[in-house]
Regions:
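Bacterial Sec-dependent N-terminal signal peptides
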Residues: 1-29, 37-40, 439-440
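Acidic, low-complexity, intrinsically disordered peripheral segments
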Residues: 6-7, 20-22, 230, 409-440
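Bacterial Sec-pathway N-terminal export signals of envelope proteins
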Residues: 20-69, 73, 226-271, 344, ...
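Short flexible linkers and secondary-structure junctions
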Residues: 22-151, 285
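Small/polar, glycine/serine/threonine/aspartate-rich low-complexity segments that form flexible
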Residues: 23-24, 71-109, 233, 239-244, ...
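Periplasmic alpha-helical coiled-coil/stalk elements that build and connect Gram-negative outer-membrane
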Residues: 27, 31, 55, 138, ...
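Sec/SRP-type N-terminal targeting helices
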Residues: 44-48, 61-62, 114-142, 192, ...
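A short glycine-centered flexible hinge/capping loop motif at secondary-structure junctions
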Residues: 184-188, 386-390, 427
Length: 440
């Protein structure tokens, strides 16, 4: 008896362990999007691109400052034959040969660019535009991550609601089978009617298994995106979503899409690149200054040799070669301009379509609410008729199926309204703003 009691206790502990293996976590849409933006690889990539563009801008700006170099050389000379015109000619006797066996040379130079056809100025403008473009691209990336969370939330909620409704319907169907079994045993109904009820139970079980699978897949995709433990089961706070939607109704706004702003800045950068290419037609001027110290052993020592001057350079070949570079820059600018025009048209189409989809979902939701009331009343009437032998088993099972379908459509339509609402906010570039999420 003691062994049996111990075994039962262990089994109970195992059962408790299994029950608590999965952690249920209630999440609002706002919380989930915040987590995704902070933890997702896409967000990290966008942040890294912004940092790279910022460093590229700083690197370009560094070219404004003077360049400074120092150098030194020490060389050993072997049997150098040195003749110097600096030797005195006052003596008629030949000078003793000089022993020159080493050379010391030290230099310090500073160069300051003055003019290069405004190349540096326009290069900085290009880098600034690209940096700003990456910041807006990052914001659009965050919006896209938010939309992905919305879609996963909708999929998970639909699957969870279907699971609940089908499971509830399964209980009713199983109870019907029990009732029909008793009636069949008492000769009140034909065996064929019992088989139809049993077949309905089998079909409902298959639908329930499929709904559970869909819920598990949607839940796994969501927790993977949010970087949550695999044992987490997300419980969607649908009431918080309804409050957010009511508090922030859609407001039409054009020109707010961050991808449009990013591409517009890329266009500005491409136009600056044309000026950079054209700057090669101009000469370059620079100020330079330096210091030289030299010691040629037993011959010459130079110290405090300061120098300064103006540097001038001009690449004559640029007259012939630079034309293609300018044409290339102009072609890239035109390419960006056409891409911006295309994106503008695409955004207008997306906003229009998203608006139509949202309005349709609202209308469908009203119809599905009416359908639930109609299907429930129809089932009640058919059930009364069946109980009074005025309708067939087929009529009863069909009415039950129509009621379940109406309930499922109603639940799915509520999720569709929320999904289409946030898709419209995304198309208008206001998804994160509608949830009062600030972007850095």
């Amino acid at each position: 008896m003691k062994k049996q009691a111990s075994l039962l206790f262990l089994l109970a502990l195992l059962g408790l362990g299994t029950g608590y293996a999965q952690e249920k976590r209630k999440l609002t849409l706002k919380e989930a999007i915040e987590m995704a933006v902070q933890n997702s690889t896409s967000a990290d990539l966008a942040t890294t691109k912004v940092k790279s563009a910022e460093l590229a801008l700083a690197n370009t700006k560094n070219n404004q400052y003077p360049g400074a170099k120092i150098s030194g050389q020490y060389m050993r000379l072997s049997s150098a034959n040195v003749k110097s015109n600096l030797q005195s000619n006052s003596s008629s006797e030949p000078a003793a040969p000089l022993k020159v066996d080493q050379l010391l040379l030290g230099q310090a130079n500073v160069t300051m660019p003055i003019f290069s056809g405004f190349k540096l100025k326009n290069s900085i403008k290009t880098s600034e535009s690209l940096y700003k473009a990456e910041t807006f691209a990052k914001k659009h990336s965050n919006e896209a991550i938010g939309l992905e969370v919305v879609e996963l939330f909708a999929s998970l909620y639909k699957a969870q609601q279907m699971t609940l409704l089908i499971a509830d319907n399964l209980k009713t169907a199983e109870q019907r089978v029990k009732d029909f079994t008793a009636m069949e045993e008492n000769g009140l109904i034909a065996r064929n009617d019992l088989l139809k009820a049993q077949l309905q139970v089998s079909n409902i079980k298959l639908a329930l298994d499929n709904a559970k699978k869909n819920a598990a897949v949607a839940n796994y995709e969501l927790i993977t995106l949010l970087k949550l433990p695999e044992s987490t089961i997300v419980d969607i706070d649908i009431e918080a979503i309804k409050k957010d939607m009511a508090a922030h109704p859609y407001q039409k706004s054009e020109g707010e899409r961050n991808d449009l702003k990013a591409l517009s800045l890329q266009k500005a950068a491409a136009e600056s690149e044309i000026k950079v290419a054209k700057s090669n037609y101009y000469p370059s001027l620079s100020l330079s200054g330096g210091y030289i110290a030299l010691d040629l052993n037993n011959v010459l020592t130079v110290t405090n040799a300061m120098n300064f001057g103006l540097g001038f350079s001009y690449d004559l070949s640029s007259i012939f070669k630079n034309g293609k570079q300018v044409q290339f820059a102009q072609s890239k600018a035109k390419e960006t301009s056409l891409a911006l025009e295309q994106l503008n048209e695409q955004v207008k189409e997306e906003v229009f379509q998203a608006n139509e989809n949202y309005n349709l979902s609202l209308k469908q939701s009203v119809v599905y609410d009416e359908a639930v009331a109609q299907a429930s009343e129809n089932y009640r009437i058919v059930k009364d008729k069946y109980d009074n032998s005025l309708s067939t088993t087929n009529d009863l099972l069909e009415a039950d199926f129509e009621q379940l379908q109406a309930q499922i459509n109603q639940a799915l339509s509520k999720a569709d309204v929320a999904q289409k609402y946030y898709e419209l906010q995304f198309a208008s570039g206001q998804l994160l703003n509608s949830l009062q999420l600030t972007q850095n």
